[in-house]
């Protein structure tokens, strides 16, 4: 902002002063805000940690428990019944003079898209680890997502009250599995009663929580000279030594001082904050959310080490004082209608304000609310850096960028390019800025699909409306119409995802829909290149329609559509208008959505236009339909092979059960990648297996292991199939198996 103000040329002095004062106000206002996400593998204790934060901050009067179904952040009926987080929820609470906006995100792989959108709204994250399990499959997934967004993070090792908890292993997992630099600022200890206590590395104190008042208070005790104190002093010295190699201010003090004992706690904290915000290290804390230990110090660490909004998202400075807000979630309230959760990146949103979403639709903010899961407090205006709920937005979808106007967005993109030394504005650079602003959403491929039908014809419209609303909330839910069967088809991320959708339609919209059997979302790819010419001539409503297209399909991983610019075809293609080329492209690419064998999406395939002759007065719709028909003919001629979704599994079981589990996996066409020791008695199997072979596998695993094994599963791409498996897959899709 300042660099735009300082280079403003002949801007009137009063206007410049107003902009500078607004800039200073925004900075001072947002310095007391922390926007954080809570990320974890399923069952690591993420929601329990969130509930304790709300309780100790005074936001709630009682402790919410997952197993009792009375949590604030898991407010959906399905979440409370299952004890898992399905939708991201936002809560705001005060702590030590700061305002913390916290997003509790799902831990189950089926809801990864919820996590992805939420990370656009936060400035830092807390990653919760299960102290008995360390880094798990979904931990790696959410960590990778946080890396993508360049988010500073803290690690909180939970469940440290358990006898099988292993703090050192968790720290080593962070270092080896996540390839990060963990910095331990706490270590586990025991108090006089044998309960979990925490030794603070920086202050050299032992922290003990009081069970009688539900952990509201805790005592700090300076450690007496002992082996524990000597070990903790060594850890403090190691911390100073590690940070001094990363922070110049601390290094200067260390060089000039005679002893590490002379380095103040405040100086260590400042150095650790800078290193954390620069993503050079990850501070590691510990506790037990369920036993009410360590949560207040975790909130202190959020305030101390994670960045304020003003320290992040400088890319949005190009908006100046104009509004820039990222939509990261939409929920539907029975009384208030659609409610849109927005992270305000720049500017101020006021009640009654007119906004433009990045897709061009105009919206009016009828009301503004402060978030507390499913409760709302109305406010009049919200400043940059904060999170707000907007009512009245009718067209906005998850992932949109809200701005004051289309002009504001274009000017911001132009300023951004100028600041990066790019003055031209070609299409590729436009796409780059869209990606930088997070406008270009990447929706994961569905791995399952099924038909959905209303209980009666009269409920069809209501069901379609419910699906539209659920799609606005959840971009990973695919809804399409199968013209062959006449059915509405849902695509989703897993069995749980589809089950939750059905359950929500019943509980929230009172429609008892019928889901068809789950089908694997196979993909198709061509076997060999193929070229053909299709000429179609027809008279429609007295107007002659005439199209002749020569198209080719070839193997290609990058581009969907290209032009054959060879000398014999270039002169013809140069006569086509850009609009005509766009129509041919749209029709051709649409045909790739449904392959000839099982109706799967055709991938790794490029359509190449060689020649096009279009009669005068021919409608665009006719050209588009001809292009689609031509590609369908090519796919049938060239033939396609099936690609099936592959899942990556981590199975943990006692050593004596491993042979039986591996024998069963081999019958499921699984590829064993590794078998690793997991503690003293267990082993962990890393395996890839086709999704088609994993139906009901959780139950089968329980039977084989007598209930002693656990499993996590997540998508791991697509793989080719042999002819026998392809034939079996076709029979399954046709309902013959």
Swiss-Prot record:
Domain tr-type G: start-end pairs: 31-310
Superkingdom as given in the UniProt entry: Eukaryota
Cell compartment(s), UniProt: Mitochondrion
Main location: mitochondrion
UniProt entry tagged with the keyword Mitochondrion: yes
Cross-referenced PANTHER family: RIBOSOME-RELEASING FACTOR 2, MITOCHONDRIAL, TRANSLATION ELONGATION FACTOR G-RELATED
Keywords: GTP-binding, Mitochondrion, Nucleotide-binding, Protein biosynthesis, Transit peptide
Stored NCBIfam families: small_GTP
UniProt transit peptide range: 1-29
MF (Gene Ontology): GTP binding; GTPase activity
Protein family membership: Belongs to the TRAFAC class translation factor GTPase superfamily. Classic translation factor GTPase family. EF-G/EF-2 subfamily.
Protein name per its UniProtKB record: Ribosome-releasing factor 2, mitochondrial
UniProt binding sites for GTP: 40-47, 104-108, 158-161
SMART domains xref list: EFG_C
An individual GO BP term: ribosome disassembly
PROSITE patterns cross-referenced by the UniProt entry: G_TR_1, G_TR_2
Function: Mitochondrial GTPase that mediates the disassembly of ribosomes from messenger RNA at the termination of mitochondrial protein biosynthesis. Not involved in the GTP-dependent ribosomal translocation step during translation elongation.
Organism from which the protein derives: Drosophila persimilis
GO annotation, cellular component aspect: mitochondrion
């Amino acid at each position: 902002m300042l660099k735009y103000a300082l280079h403003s040329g002949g801007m009137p002095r009063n206007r410049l002063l107003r902009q500078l004062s607004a800039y200073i106000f925004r900075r001072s206002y947002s310095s007391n805000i922390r926007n954080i996400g809570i990320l974890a593998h399923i069952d690591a204790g993420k929601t329990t940690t969130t509930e304790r934060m709300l309780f100790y901050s005074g936001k709630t009067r009682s402790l919410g428990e997952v197993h009792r179904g009375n949590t604030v952040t898991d407010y959906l009926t399905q979440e409370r019944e299952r004890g898992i987080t399905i939708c991201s929820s936002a809560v705001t609470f005060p702590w030590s003079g700061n305002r913390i906006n916290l997003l509790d995100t799902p831990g189950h792989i089926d809801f990864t898209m919820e996590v992805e959108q939420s990370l656009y709204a936060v400035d830092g994250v807390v990653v919760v680890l299960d102290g008995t399990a360390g880094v798990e499959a979904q931990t790696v997934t959410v960590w990778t997502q946080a890396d993508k967004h360049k988010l500073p993070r803290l690690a909180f090792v939970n469940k440290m009250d358990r006898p099988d908890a292993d703090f050192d292993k968790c720290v080593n997992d962070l270092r080896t599995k996540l390839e990060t630099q963990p910095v331990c600022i706490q270590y586990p200890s025991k108090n006089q009663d044998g309960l979990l206590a925490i030794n603070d590395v920086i202050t050299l104190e032992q922290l003990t929580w009081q069970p009688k008042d539900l952990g509201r208070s805790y005592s700090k005790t300076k450690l007496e000279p002992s082996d524990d104190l000597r070990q903790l002093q060594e850890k403090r010295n190691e911390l100073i030594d590690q940070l001094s190699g990363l922070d110049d201010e601390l290094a200067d003090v260390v060089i000039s001082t005679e002893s590490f004992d002379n380095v103040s706690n405040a100086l260590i904290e400042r150095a650790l904050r800078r290193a954390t915000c620069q993503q050079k290290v990850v501070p590691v804390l510990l506790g037990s959310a369920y036993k009410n230990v360590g949560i207040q110090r975790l909130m202190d660490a959020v305030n101390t080490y994670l960045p304020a909004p003003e320290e992040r998202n400088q890319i949005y400075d190009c908006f100046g004082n104009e509004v820039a807000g990222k939509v990261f979630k939409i929920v539907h309230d029975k009384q208030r209608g659609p409610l849109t959760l927005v992270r305000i990146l720049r500017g101020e949103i006021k009640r009654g304000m007119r906004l433009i979403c990045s897709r061009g639709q105009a919206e009016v903010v009828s009301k503004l609310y402060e978030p507390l899961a499913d409760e709302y407090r109305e406010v009049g205006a919200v400043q940059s850096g904060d999170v707000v709920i907007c009512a009245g937005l009718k067209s906005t979808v998850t992932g949109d960028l809200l701005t004051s106007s289309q002009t504001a967005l274009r000017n911001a993109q132009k300023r951004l390019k100028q600041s990066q030394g790019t003055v031209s504005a070609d299409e590729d650079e436009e796409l780059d800025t869209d990606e930088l602003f997070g406008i270009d959403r990447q929706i994961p491929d569905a791995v399952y699909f099924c038909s959905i039908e209303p209980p009666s014809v009269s409920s069809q419209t209501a069901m379609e409306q419910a699906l539209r609303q659920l799609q606005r909330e959840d971009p990973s839910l695919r809804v399409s119409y199968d013209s062959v069967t006449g059915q509405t088809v849902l695509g989703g991320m897993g069995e749980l995802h589809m089950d939750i959708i059905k359950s929500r339609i019943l509980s929230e919209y009172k429609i008892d829909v019928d889901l068809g059997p789950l089908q694997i979302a196979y993909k198709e790819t061509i076997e060999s290149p193929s070229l053909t010419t299709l000429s179609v001539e027809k008279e429609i409503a007295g107007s002659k329609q005439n199209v002749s297209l020569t198209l080719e399909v070839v193997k290609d991983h990058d581009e969907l559509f290209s032009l054959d610019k060879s000398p014999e075809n270039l002169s013809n293609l140069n006569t086509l208008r850009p609009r005509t080329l766009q129509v041919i492209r749209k029709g051709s690419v649409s045909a790739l959505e449904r392959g000839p064998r099982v109706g799967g999406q055709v991938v790794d395939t490029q359509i190449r236009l060689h020649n096009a002759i279009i009669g005068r007065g021919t409608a665009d719709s006719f050209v588009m339909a001809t292009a689609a028909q031509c590609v369908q003919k090519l796919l049938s001629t060239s033939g396609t092979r099936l690609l099936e979704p592959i899942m990556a599994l981590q199975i943990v079981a006692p050593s004596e059960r491993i042979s039986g589990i591996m024998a069963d996996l081999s019958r499921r066409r699984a590829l064993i990648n590794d078998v690793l020791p997991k503690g003293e008695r267990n082993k962990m199997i890393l395996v890839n297996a086709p999704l088609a072979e994993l139906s009901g596998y959780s139950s089968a695993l329980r039977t084989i292991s007598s209930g002693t094994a656990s499993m996590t599963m997540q998508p791991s791409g697509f793989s080719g199939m042999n002819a026998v498996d392809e034939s079996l897959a076709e029979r399954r899709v046709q309902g013959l198996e």
